[in-house]
Amino acid sequence: DRSIKNPEVFVKTNVLGTAVMLNCAKAAWELPDGTFKADKKFLHVSTDEVYGSLEDDGSYFYETTPYAPHSPYSASKASSDMLVKAYIDTYKFPANITNCSNNYGPYQFPEKLIPLIINNALQGKKLPVYGDGKNVRDWLYVEDHCKAIDMVCNGGKIGEVYNVGGHNERPNIFIVKTIIAQLHDRLKDDGISEDLIKHVADRLGHDRRYGIDPTKIKNDLGWYPETPFEKGIVLTIDWYLDHEEWMEHITSGNYQKYYEEMYKNK
């Protein structure tokens, strides 16, 4: 959402920022003969959004899927991926790229769907859902993602790209209704119900479906997502219920201004 309102910030951060990081790493790690220190590797963490959108036909994103970004954010990430690939090809720079699906879990900033819905429901606020709510995302629990990153850092072949997916495809409206049901059952609060759901105008450039095939990282490194969504969402809700003070702190000030601006006409 932020990239739609202010794309320049994302270009500066994701494109120019990646270029700065690459240049700094190259300067620090390059040896006089043009090779690089053997114990160094640059890991570029990217997104499945660079691949565009999938139809609801059982297809998946693979490492060989052509890039087709649809938003300023995904275009900036695609550009940064290409920069890393260019350094690998041009300088034999020691790097890997990972493209992951939607993360969720503890400490996620509340502009993201799952913490946003949890926070709003606890406060009795409306739960904004874009369009018909049937956009599908592949949900990856954050600890599973961290394990994948560790495996790629320590075992990934230089120059390779690895897709990291959760095998947990769910429509957004399913996510929202699941959170409502979980909170209602735990808190015995009749105010937390599906009546809070408010469908709002669809987001510009909103991709319909994402789905990653993680076969390559499974075969090469032995990684596979361990956390089914039904378990991960319980762990996530537990964490936010146990850390309401953190949520109150993080949603004050600048975030509150952003939230009000984003949804003021919806």
Predicted regions and their residues:
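N-terminal Rossmann-like NAD(P)+-binding domain of SDR-like oxidoreductases, especially those catalyzing
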Residues: 1-103, 143, 153, 235, ...
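Nucleotide-sugar-dependent glycosyltransferase donor-binding/catalytic pocket residues
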Residues: 11, 106, 138
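A general lysine-centric signal
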Residues: 41, 77, 112, 216-218
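Residues that scaffold the ATP/ADP-binding catalytic core of kinase and kinase-like folds
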Residues: 53-54, 106-107, 220
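Hydrophobic alpha-helix immediately C-terminal to the catalytic Tyr-X-X-X-Lys motif of short-chain
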Residues: 79, 83, 87, 117, ...
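C-terminal substrate-binding subdomain of Rossmann-fold SDR/epimerase-dehydratase oxidoreductases
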Residues: 115, 121-266
